[in-house]
Amino acid sequence: MRNLDNIPRIDEIEVNFNYKTKFDSEEFARQLKDQEKGMNELTVYEYQQNRKRFIDEGRAIEGNAAQQAAREKALSKKIEELFESGMSWEEAEGKAASWLKTQAALHNPDQIAGGNPLHIGGLGDKRINSSLGSQWRYRIDIVDEQIKELEKSLTLEQRKNTYLNVKLTY
């Protein structure tokens, strides 16, 4: 992990998402904050490369294996946690399997937003993850347009050393 204090950043880009009251507000805020943090750990160059790959190829297939590994690890951890809390092993397996059905392995940020397909930031409510993912389709152009304009004034070296400055709100 890079030390991201006192580094060159672009001017702030704000992107607003729609929150639906059917979702847990704390979980929605957590997932959005994790997406923001992930974006702000990208250089302009990394963002551009990841976006180009996503536009050209869609979701990267290697991201599926990373997500599956994260889900398996979380399932094992959940079974252990429930077993240690006093459940039988069989009951813990059943409860953990039910819990896992509600969870998605989270890219931070989503691949559509320039995320690395191998970077999984944990699990979270899959309905919220799906909502955020679908909203990116209509919001990523805001970021792309500003980065494209900024690119004109940055050298390649500057793009490799200047970080995003994105604020995700709802």
Question: Residue ranges of each PLM-predicted region?
Answer:
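Nuclease and nuclease-like effector domains acting on nucleic acids or nucleotide cofactors
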Residues: 1-105, 109-170
